Amino acid sequence: KYNTNLSDADIQARVAELIEKKVPENNTEDVKKFLFNCIDLTTLNSTDSDKSVMHFTEKVNQFDDEYPDLKNVAAICVYPNFAAIVKNTLEVDGVNIACVSGGFPSSQTFIEVKVAETALAIAEGADEIDIVISIGKFLSGDYEGMCEEIQELKEVCKERHLKVILETGALKSASNIKKASILSMYSGADFIKTSTGTVSYTHLRAHETRSNL
């Protein structure tokens, strides 16, 4: 049903064409404001603490007073153990609590651990869950195993958004990126994202984003 036999060169050429045609007309203040409102303000540091996450959340609480002409960010994204801190500190409406889960960022742990971590994050206040696909399963051709994990975690999330990160730099080709995108959406992903930004060989390129579309 879907053509995943893509040429990297063709994708790059198409992206270059889109950039040339579309960037100038979208380089406007309204578009930039819209994009700002889509941001997940994120802290995923090994040095994060209750105090630092509270301070981080207070910045969002104060945002409307400091920037009354801008809409606030879409969400605050933290590790699952800080979900309750954000929930108890956040005072503004319209900003969700997002948590990474499922053995983030490598996705290398037992499915039972992924399920438990996701359930605990939701119990602590998470509105959205960010996971990474099981890249090892995908690259070894175990598509069923990869999809089953996503389906299990979506069942835990229920009505809450499940955002699935493809880690496109590890997938190497436009064909793999499109295939992983389709499989993730088929398995219940509410959103797909390109990369964690934590892996040294992951370089976000425009043609990788195009392959998601």
Predicted regions and their residues:
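Charged, compositionally biased N-terminal leader segments and the immediate start
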Residues: 1-35
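Hydrophobic faces of well-ordered beta-strands that scaffold small-molecule active sites
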Residues: 37-39, 74-78, 97-100, 129-131, ...
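Active-site mouth loops of central-metabolism enzymes
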Residues: 41-49, 100-113, 139, 165-176
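Glycine-rich, proline-tolerant flexible connector loops at the mouths of alpha/beta enzymes
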Residues: 44-47, 67-77, 85, 131-144, ...
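Active-site cofactor/substrate anionic-group-binding motifs, chiefly glycine-
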Residues: 72-124
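Conserved anion-binding
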Residues: 128-181
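Conserved small/polar residues in nucleotide/adenosyl-binding loops
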Residues: 202-209
